[in-house]
Amino acid sequence: MEYKNTLLMPKTEFPMRGNLPKREPAMQEKWAEMNIYEKVQEHTKGRPLFVLHDGPPYANGDIHMGHALNKVLKDFIVRYKSMTGFCAPYVPGWDTHGLPIEQALTNKGVKRKEMTVAEFRKLCAEYAYEQVERQREQFKRLGVRADWDNPYITLEPAYEAQQIKVFGDMAKKGYIYKGQKPVYWSPTSESALAEAEIEYQDKKSASIYVAFPVKDGKNVLEGDEKYIIWTTTPWTLPANLGISVHPELEYAIVKVNDEKYIIASELFETVAKTLEWENAEVVKTVKGSELEYTVAKHPFYDRDSLVMLGDHVTTDAGTGCVHTAPGHGEDDFVVGKKYGLEVLCPVDDKGVLTEEAPGFEGLFYDKANKPITEKLEEVGALLKLTFITHSYPHDWRTKKPIIFRATAQWFASIEAFRKELLEAVAETKWVPAWGETRLHNMVRDRGDWCISRQRAWGVPIPVFYAENGDPIITDETINHVADLFREHGSNVWFEREAKDLLPEGFTHPGSPNGEFRKETDIMDVWFDSGSSHQAVLEERDDLQRPADLYLEGSDQYRGWFNSSLSTAVAVTGKAPYKGVLSHGFVLDGEGRKMSKSIGNIVVPKKIMDQLGGDILRLWVSSVDYQSDVRISDDILKQVAEVYRKIRNTFRFLLGNLDDFKPSENTVAVAELREVDRYMLVKLNDLITKVKEAYETYDFAAVYHAIHNFCTIDLSSFYLDFAKDILYIEGANHEDRRAIQTVLYDVLVALTKLVTPILPHTADEVWPYIPGVTEESVQLTDMPEAVQLDDAEALKTKWDAFMTLRDDVLKALEVARNEKVIGKSLNASITLYPTAEMKAMLESINEDLKQLFIVSEYKLGGMMEEAPADAPKYEHTAVVVAQATGETCERCWVVSETIGKDAEHETLCERCATVVKENYVK
């Protein structure tokens, strides 16, 4: 007889190799055929809603690792929620207006100037839709489950119409105004920028100290002094109209040779050192407030510079006397407005100085620094010139420096509802908790929001102007424009005359001749995506406002979290979200930012093509995503190893359940052995731990819990000793069916627990599980932890056994290294445990040699009675020797009963019995 044919070895068609790059697309096709998204919505219909609102990625180019991290995290949450009593719809979105698309078309050779605005915008829309399609396929390949056929896209007419409504509502409340004000201006984009479109980079700049002679000392100064200002932007000096000092600071009149200079007293030593003064002496001090309304002369123009008081003046750098140009700075503008100064801005859209800067007109602002400095030297006003490298704002798209420039722009007044914004921030749940402080400070400190852009590709600002220049924004005009956009899209604004965009028969007192013109500026793209709570959450039947969660990268505190909050609070008085969760950026393996120049860019597509989407998803679950995260080939190799372990666990479980019918073979919990019940306790602990981790969005805890359960609880313990029963005993042996009962519960629970993270693998495992009826594991719920009555006692006892077992394993390892034994089944062990452990061992009814995977087990005396040369561990001393007897051909146990049964000379007594009872006819 071939004894190997009497072993019940694992049998399954579930493949050992994942081959995910090939298998996943096939699984995704299957999901598409069965309409898995709709099926899940149907299955969860009527449950409480959980809405995670998708922040729209920008529709340009392939998805990068940041996109992958973001979408996969969202997918974890949505999938988990739909398996825990919620209906969790997920509507993906795209942000589709803005400069990058205009630039992409220019790079493709589109001649913008040779076509109408409407024609150019049509090309922009076509390009945007192509990009949406491209990214949609890549997101699907990640295994993200979403309403892919019905996304929201910011260029779609229905969306634009709602955005116009948001603008109209804000205007109605008096929050929208037009004003001349310094804004971030990008000469390279020829447009105003919002704060969210700025990034800081190092820049080399001239650093100059300039003397402004006093013209009128107002009886505080004698008139022969000079104010010293410091600036790193010499090109703004033609726009200088004043000098700001702090009312509370003390100012010194410093005599240096024959000159007298005015600086802040506490900066005396710093300035003296910088300007290399010798024998400088302070001849008088005055309070800043006393200097108000004194007058200085502009260094090279025949005009005055008024001395004003400003709280923005600090002693962090410079001289305490601040060059003030209301056309080129926020603080300058505010102070200048208070003192009635004009807003002089002698720089045009392209960053070129105009005739309002005589002597420098026609020069690009950066190129004007040198001639202006030379002019200062010529007139004797330049006290010092050096160069410094400092952090300076740049256009996030063109990567070129920006300037502050006063222009006529449309603004949303944040000041008008700042208090409500701060209250909304306080009512929101922030993860990580520092997010609250971050957004609170941003809202507290931010100026009014410049919402106009001087570009073509975007949603037009729906304002008309009367003949007398009055802006027209009424309910009637807003609703009419919104209806036109809903029907024709926003291109209609550029295709029709103003009169054809107004309601029929519209009149206005400012237009006696019935003539009107329309605004040509478009809205900031942050106003587009920031209106999604209205256009998507409020408008879609399957969603609701506020959303339960917004989840984006930490750069969105100043971006989408901020703009969404501003428009929502302005329109509804409430935040658009109940909770906000943010993640960090993806860096390379060494913690460096990814860049083309370093050549360290990791692309999601490459990972999916080589390893598979589930490996990428498993990586996402493994990292502490609330900080910046790292990815590299080595890191992915480790993750792939963990995946292999999880997959092999599934395969082993399936293989050993091939002949198990849950309806017929399940053993009642009360009839299970203690060790089996202990395994159920461990499983229930896992279920509880994993669900708690999912609830708190702690996916790394899910990853580690599942990995540890597979390697430590299953592979190293339960499955290891179970083989001796599963393979060796007869099919219906009670111990075998008991273990299978536990394995079945483990398999079903484990498959469900990994579903949010490894959906492809979970749905691949699912149909192989005996007795399941659902078409997909996604149509099931998370497992419930079942509390066993004696769970605590089992845990105490068997956890103690596991620590003792560790000591035994160490002893076996030593014996193996010393060649006392080959494998552990060659061993006979005698234990000399502590009193506590001895009592525990004596209370165990199981076959202990089986649990230790040795051929012979004896319990000796107490630990102190152990032979002197026996290795002693924390809980026991262990004597390891060769087991006596021969090795059984069938179970490989060393036994003295080999050949006792004459018909089966090479088998031990146990195997001979099994073979006779089950295989001999």
From Swiss-Prot:
<protein>
    <recommendedName>
        <fullName>Isoleucine--tRNA ligase 1</fullName>
        <ecNumber>6.1.1.5</ecNumber>
    </recommendedName>
</protein>
<dbReference type="GO" id="GO:0005524">
    <property type="term" value="F:ATP binding"/>
</dbReference>
<dbReference type="InterPro" id="IPR001412">
    <property type="entry name" value="aa-tRNA-synth_I_CS"/>
</dbReference>
<dbReference type="InterPro" id="IPR023585">
    <property type="entry name" value="Ile-tRNA-ligase_type1"/>
</dbReference>
<keyword id="KW-0030">Aminoacyl-tRNA synthetase</keyword>
<dbReference type="InterPro" id="IPR002300">
    <property type="entry name" value="aa-tRNA-synth_Ia"/>
</dbReference>
<dbReference type="Pfam" id="PF08264">
    <property type="entry name" value="Anticodon_1"/>
</dbReference>
<dbReference type="InterPro" id="IPR002301">
    <property type="entry name" value="Ile-tRNA-ligase"/>
</dbReference>
<dbReference type="GO" id="GO:0005829">
    <property type="term" value="C:cytosol"/>
</dbReference>
<dbReference type="InterPro" id="IPR014729">
    <property type="entry name" value="Rossmann-like_a/b/a_fold"/>
</dbReference>
<feature type="binding site">
    <location>
        <position position="596"/>
    </location>
    <ligand>
        <name>ATP</name>
    </ligand>
</feature>
<dbReference type="GO" id="GO:0004822">
    <property type="term" value="F:isoleucine-tRNA ligase activity"/>
</dbReference>
<dbReference type="GO" id="GO:0008270">
    <property type="term" value="F:zinc ion binding"/>
</dbReference>
<keyword id="KW-0963">Cytoplasm</keyword>
<feature type="binding site">
    <location>
        <position position="911"/>
    </location>
    <ligand>
        <name>Zn(2+)</name>
    </ligand>
</feature>
<keyword id="KW-0479">Metal-binding</keyword>
<dbReference type="InterPro" id="IPR050081">
    <property type="entry name" value="Ile-tRNA_ligase"/>
</dbReference>
<feature type="short sequence motif" description="'HIGH' region">
    <location>
        <begin position="57"/>
        <end position="67"/>
    </location>
</feature>
<comment type="similarity">
    <text>Belongs to the class-I aminoacyl-tRNA synthetase family. IleS type 1 subfamily.</text>
</comment>
<dbReference type="GO" id="GO:0006428">
    <property type="term" value="P:isoleucyl-tRNA aminoacylation"/>
</dbReference>
<dbReference type="InterPro" id="IPR033708">
    <property type="entry name" value="Anticodon_Ile_BEm"/>
</dbReference>
<keyword id="KW-0547">Nucleotide-binding</keyword>
<comment type="function">
    <text>Catalyzes the attachment of isoleucine to tRNA(Ile). As IleRS can inadvertently accommodate and process structurally similar amino acids such as valine, to avoid such errors it has two additional distinct tRNA(Ile)-dependent editing activities. One activity is designated as 'pretransfer' editing and involves the hydrolysis of activated Val-AMP. The other activity is designated 'posttransfer' editing and involves deacylation of mischarged Val-tRNA(Ile).</text>
</comment>
<dbReference type="InterPro" id="IPR010663">
    <property type="entry name" value="Znf_FPG/IleRS"/>
</dbReference>
<keyword id="KW-0648">Protein biosynthesis</keyword>
<feature type="short sequence motif" description="'KMSKS' region">
    <location>
        <begin position="593"/>
        <end position="597"/>
    </location>
</feature>
<dbReference type="Pfam" id="PF00133">
    <property type="entry name" value="tRNA-synt_1"/>
</dbReference>
<dbReference type="GO" id="GO:0002161">
    <property type="term" value="F:aminoacyl-tRNA deacylase activity"/>
</dbReference>
<dbReference type="GO" id="GO:0000049">
    <property type="term" value="F:tRNA binding"/>
</dbReference>
<feature type="binding site">
    <location>
        <position position="552"/>
    </location>
    <ligand>
        <name>L-isoleucyl-5'-AMP</name>
    </ligand>
</feature>
<keyword id="KW-0067">ATP-binding</keyword>
<dbReference type="InterPro" id="IPR009080">
    <property type="entry name" value="tRNAsynth_Ia_anticodon-bd"/>
</dbReference>
<dbReference type="InterPro" id="IPR013155">
    <property type="entry name" value="M/V/L/I-tRNA-synth_anticd-bd"/>
</dbReference>
<feature type="binding site">
    <location>
        <position position="891"/>
    </location>
    <ligand>
        <name>Zn(2+)</name>
    </ligand>
</feature>
<comment type="subunit">
    <text>Monomer.</text>
</comment>
<keyword id="KW-0436">Ligase</keyword>
<keyword id="KW-0862">Zinc</keyword>
<feature type="binding site">
    <location>
        <position position="908"/>
    </location>
    <ligand>
        <name>Zn(2+)</name>
    </ligand>
</feature>
<feature type="binding site">
    <location>
        <position position="888"/>
    </location>
    <ligand>
        <name>Zn(2+)</name>
    </ligand>
</feature>
<dbReference type="Pfam" id="PF06827">
    <property type="entry name" value="zf-FPG_IleRS"/>
</dbReference>
<dbReference type="InterPro" id="IPR009008">
    <property type="entry name" value="Val/Leu/Ile-tRNA-synth_edit"/>
</dbReference>
